[in-house]
């Protein structure tokens, strides 16, 4: 009888990928990055083990949004005090906090739980084209979309 292969946490080999967000649509970029972080691109993917790779996203400030989302899409956060709801448009987020915009989109596509939080720690987002991870020798990953 054959048994299904289950990856073990200490057997997982992690690679580093660089993804250029310049000119890419936010949601399409986030879904592919989330798949890389989960390890869905590997034949050894196991749902209950973090077998994903590290992903470096550069040029976060050049990510695109379709339609009127730059002015219409709103990002909410709350200070947990009465009347503490803060609202920012996507345009404000892209100009002032582009890293948070991509991180929020990717986090929403990862599992909700301790495994998802562990996967999210392997995401590294940078505003410009420079990043401090040259020592890891990251491969350039071309997005499909």
Curated annotation (Swiss-Prot):
- Could you tell me which CDD domains the record lists for this protein? Ribosomal_L13
Role according to the record: This protein is one of the early assembly proteins of the 50S ribosomal subunit, although it is not seen to bind rRNA by itself. It is important during the early stages of 50S assembly.
Please identify the protein, giving its name as recorded: Large ribosomal subunit protein uL13
On assembly, the entry states:
Part of the 50S ribosomal subunit.
HAMAP family assigned: Ribosomal_uL13
Q: Report the sequence similarity comment from the record.
A: Belongs to the universal ribosomal protein uL13 family.
Q: Does the keyword Ribonucleoprotein apply?
A: yes
- Membrane keyword on record: no
Which is one Gene Ontology cellular component term of this protein?
cytosolic large ribosomal subunit
Q: Identify the Gene3D superfamilies for this entry.
A: Ribosomal protein L13
Single GO term (MF): mRNA binding
Cite a single GO BP annotation. Answer: negative regulation of translation
Any idea which UniProt keywords this protein has? Ribonucleoprotein, Ribosomal protein
Domain of life here? Bacteria
**What NCBIfam families has UniProt attached to this entry?**
rplM_bact
């Amino acid at each position: 009888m054959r048994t299904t292969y289950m990856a073990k946490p200490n057997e997982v080999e992690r690679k580093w990928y660089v993804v250029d967000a310049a000119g890419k649509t936010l949601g399409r970029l986030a879904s592919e990055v989330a798949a890389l972080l989960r390890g869905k691109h590997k034949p050894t993917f196991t749902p209950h083990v973090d077998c994903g790779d590290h992903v470096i996203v550069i040029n976060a400030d050049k990510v695109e949004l379709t339609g009127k989302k730059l002015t219409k899409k709103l990002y909410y956060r709350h200070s947990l005090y009465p009347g503490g709801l803060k609202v920012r448009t996507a345009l404000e987020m892209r100009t002032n906090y582009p890293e948070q915009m991509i991180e929020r989109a990717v986090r929403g596509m990862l599992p909700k739980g301790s495994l998802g939080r562990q996967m999210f720690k392997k995401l590294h987002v940078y505003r410009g084209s420079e990043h401090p991870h040259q020592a890891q020798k990251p491969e350039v990953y071309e997005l499909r979309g």
